[in-house]
Structure formats: C-alpha cells, structure tokens
Amino acid sequence: MSAQLAAATPAIASEAAFDTMLAELAVRRTEFREQRHVPRDFVATLKRAGIYRSATPAVFGGEPQPPAVFLDRIERISAVDGSTGWVASFGSALVYLAALPYDTQAQLYADGPDVAFAGALFPPQAGEPTARGYRLDGRWKFASGCSGADVLGVGMPGDADSDGKPRTAVLRPDQAEIVPEWDVVGMRGTGSFDLVVRGVEVPREWTFVRGGTPTVDEPLYRYPTIAYAAQVLAVVGAGVARAALDHAVRVGGGYAGVTGAPKLADRAYYRDAVARAEAELRSARAWFYEATGQVWDTVLAGDPATDRQNAELRLASAHLARTSSDVVARLIEVSGTAPIHTTHPLQDLAGDALVPKQHAFLGPAVFDAAGAVLMGLPATTPGFR
C-alpha cells in the first residue's frame, strides 16, 4: 500500500462511518425526540464516526479537525436531526478541557481519545473551598447530551485566580444525579436535563477556566474558544434551515391545499419566498465559513486571532443563527394551512431552528458587543472572548 493511500484510508473509513451514522439517524430521529435524549448506543455510533475525537489533542491520540471541517459535519448531522446535531456539536467542547492541567488531561484520555463531554454551566454556583479543591452542592440546567456523556461539567463563578472568568468543574457521571426535566418545543431530543450535585469534592486540578490558557500547544487550541463554542451551535441552525428548504422544494410541486388553489410551486409568492430564503441562508453561511477560514489561516501562521477577527466570528455566528430561524419561519408563512398540524415537518424544524438563536452565545447582545469591537471599543458583554 502506498504511503499516500495509507494516509487516506483513515479518512475514507471515517467518512464511511459518518454516512452510515447519518442513515441510521434518519431512521431513529423520531425515537430520540420521543424519548427526549440521544441514547448512549447512538453516542457510540457518533464516536465511531470520529465526532468525539475531533477536538481531542493529537498528543493524546485525538484527530483534531480544522474548525470548518467539524462545523460542516455538524451541519450535515443537523440537516437530518437538529437535536442530534446539537448533542454532537459538543464534540468540540474538548477545546475547553485543553485548559485543564496536562497531567489531568492525560488521565482523562487514558482509555482513549473518544470522550463525550456534557456541561451544565448555568446558573454558576460557587463551591466551598477545601484543602484539595472545591465542595459542590447545587443544581445546574441545560446539560445537553448528559445521558450519553463520559464526563460532566458544572459551572462555577469566576474568582481571583481565574481573572474573573467562570470555572468549570469536571465530574464523573456517578457524581451527579440527572433530573430529566426537559419539555420544550425545539431540540426535544437533546436531553438537556438538569444536573444535581450533593456534597461532591472536586480536586482543583479537575477544574478549568472557560476560555483559559490551554496547556496543550496545538493549532486548534489557539483558535478562539468561546467563538468556536458559539459557532458549533449556530451551524446546527443552518442544518435545520437546510432541511426546511429541501422540504419546501420537495413538496412545492405537489401540495395544492383543500381550496382548489394552485400548487405551491405555481404560486409566485411561494417561489419568491423559497428563492429569497435560499439566497439568505447561503449568503449567511458563506460569510460564516469565510470568517472561519480566515481565522484558521491566522492561527496556522502562528499568529493570535485579533479582537476584530473574534468579533467577526461571533457576529457571523449570531447572524447565521438568526437567518436560519427566519428562513424556517418564512417557509411556514407561505406554506398554507398544512404547517398548522403538529405532525407537519416544518413544526419540528421551526422549534429546532429557534433554539440556537435564543442561546446566550448567539442572542441580541452579541450584535451590540461585536459592533463595539468593530468600532474600536471594548466589548459590551462579559465573556465575549
């Protein structure tokens, strides 16, 4: 076997596993929505597709992917099922854990590079300082993917040692109780349940500062961490919007409604709406990936991303999330009475597309903060970088 072919074989195998995973997901997505979480057996399937080694440091056996490659994969998953795309997006969260002490990371990856992490970061709750670290007692929300996670994280406020940036404590699943409270209109299958921790002492070396300095020197961990966390969520919305557009095109030639009106595709306003939605989604998506590539090139050149580049990543992400949600809403508006039924595909897609836009990383405050940075002013929201 030639060296070139040998090098290509893992990528080919990974792509085959990825396609197999997508085919299984198309069959099981209703199951996940009904049970309100992605089960552990499918998390194992995501692992075989390489999702949970995409942000594991190479020094620990990982295959860290350029951000654009990982984002494209999450978008493709989300076009099949937004909830699974959302859970899979946290395969990128291991960039956070690169701020753990090096020896702690060596323990974390001792059994292999495929580690599924789920965090419940809000509301941040202070731990009681101990000689070894912190004693935690509290309840945290939105632990997406916690049912299938190998390790969990809970949020703590910033302190003097973290320069005010929030901390995360890393826990084994048996150290937390999962409370399955999750009754929502969008991303129902994410299993974004609550975590309850009672009197658990976490060693200091098993905590890290979110967005803190990484202890691993590889290119991915020099890419803006918080911006990347926003990007992986925004691109879920893009995948959902793509599914909605594909549905609109597919049914447009067949649905005529009960009044005898022309088929949707024969109505000028429907064609206009679909065309505008296509243009808007692809334009927002193009800028999103353009900004991603520019920052990655900067990182690969050995230079730090500038504040302006970070702001553009945050802005492009918020814009993509908003555009994706608007696209689905517009398609519902022009699709007649069919989408009012709870079983209509656009109903689920509308709820799924709404969730990224509502996330704190992608909400209205991001536009203000990005605008400030673009005009040479300090960011107006904490944790912008």
What are these regions (language model features)?
Residues M1-A23, F384-R385:
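Basic/polar N-terminal segments that are highly enriched at the extreme N-terminus
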Residues A26, T30-R33, S283-H319, A329-I340:
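C-terminal helix-coil-helix/basic helical segment that borders enzyme active sites and/or dimer interfaces
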Residues V38-R48, Y52-A149:
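Glycine-rich flavin
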Residues R139-A176, G336:
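DPxDG-like acidic metal-binding loop motif
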Residues V185-M187, S192-R282:
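Glycine-rich beta->alpha junctions and the first turn(s) of the following alpha-helix
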Residues G239, A275-R282, R314, A318-S325, ...:
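Generic structural signal for well-ordered, non-transmembrane alpha-helical segments
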Residues D326-E333, P364-D368:
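Short segments within alpha-helical structural elements
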Residues T337-R385:
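Glycine-rich phosphate/cofactor-binding loops in nucleotide/flavin-utilizing enzymes
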